[in-house]
Amino acid sequence: MQDVRGYEEHEPRVMKAMQSGYPRFVVHEYVRQLLDFYVEREGLLGRSVVLVAGERALQDVRDFCGTGVDCVEVDAGVFLLHCDLEDVDLAKKLRKCVQHIGCSVYSRQAEDLLVKHALKAGLFPEVVAEGNSLQAVRDMLAQQIGCGSSDVLLTSSGMSAFYSGFRGVQALQRGRGRTAWVQLGWLYLDSGCVLKEFLGEEETLDYSYDVSDVDAIIEQLRTYGDSLAAVVLEYPSNPLLQTCEVHRIAAAVREFGGVLVIDPSIASVLNVDVLPHADLLVTSLTKYTAVEGDVMCGAIAVNPSSPYYSVLATCVADNHSPAYGRDIARLGHEIKTAPTAVAQMSQNASRLHAYLAQHPGVKKIYFAGSSKYLGAIAQEQGSVGAVISVELEGDMEIFYNAVKVMKGPSFGTRFTLLCPFMYLAHYDLVTTDVGRTFLAEVGIAPELIRISVGTEPYEAIEAVFAEALDRSV
């Protein structure tokens, strides 16, 4: 935990030791080398710089950051945005914008450019799919999601999918004079930031953190009348894995003229079938589908049964940032084994949930598989996802330091992964009295541990958690 705090507080000891990290938060070595090359070539030493892929994303970043940010197209479709290093607030705003909307250049594209400019001898050897990977991935996803292949768009990251979907819905509903947005439940950090930062002055954002009271949610939606634009939720929610009568919410949103956006990333489209309830599905494919956790990619799917299908499909397509070709090729290889791996994750997660639920060291446990509503959306019996969240009776820090699994902010990998979720996603909330009070109000424990259960032999997984729990109490 000392290293987690050190990362959040940017301690030189920790930052120097980190060779890599989640790509939207930690700049990959290949991207860093590419930045150094471009900065020297363009004579921009002493400037704060980021890379953005695609003209659509470029325009959005420039619109958001305003004056003071300049741009150079350093390679075809690749843009170097830069600002005064002394303007700390603008430099931070620029970095955060690229993080939120997921539009950066990632490692495979950076590697290709390093090779192009003779800065790297060759490509890292890896197995990829042959043939038309884009079509193959879209075909498989369409089968899982329940739509046509043409209704699925691949994006450069999961956040790019969320942002592109948001912009598409926003364009549709602004044209209809609808301005009221509603967030149901807790949203992932950057998803929430997109809603807060990119709505216009004439648009509003309200929150309903308790997704269990569907009657109250429907009455709230009714009050917006003809102004309801969209309702956004993760289903199941992250990190508490909450589910509800989503079909009732969907019916109400449609009755009131809104658009329902659902993100099923925490369980994946391989486990849950939510498109029948949504107008728009947005999801990360970095989780579950890329079981090695080594591909940045997302997907958007428009429900053919939505009354807004034609216009929404056009709006989303106009706003999306496509996935990079080599990322798709790698994903095309991994997606072939993903269903088998994901089924094993679900099976192991169910067994670990049963073990943790009766362990005296666990105070509270959250698991989608224990919900009475999951069966209505599960792809098949036992499709529960890999994620479990727990509150501990004992010392969280002792447990975290002792548990011998990989630690990091992602999930849905073939290897078990664990993180102190609120410390990594909302460090500002867990380190202030005001923040902790807010978390208590919405029912999230600051010391919550989120576990993504992998495909290792179950007995080995249980033994690791048993040892760490015994130490913590």
Functional labels for PLM-detected ranges:
Residues 1-160, 168-170, 184-200, 216:
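Conserved N-terminal alpha-helix of the aminotransferase class I/II PLP-enzyme fold
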Residues 3-22, 30, 315-398, 402-403:
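Structural motif of enzymes handling amino- and sulfur-group chemistry
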Residues 88, 394-401, 458-463:
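Short, conserved charged micro-motifs
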Residues 311-312, 398-406, 464-469:
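Short amphipathic alpha-helices in soluble, non-transmembrane regions
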Residues 373-380, 422-446:
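Active-site-adjacent capping/gating segments
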Residues 403-435:
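Conserved PLP cofactor-binding pocket of PLP-dependent enzymes
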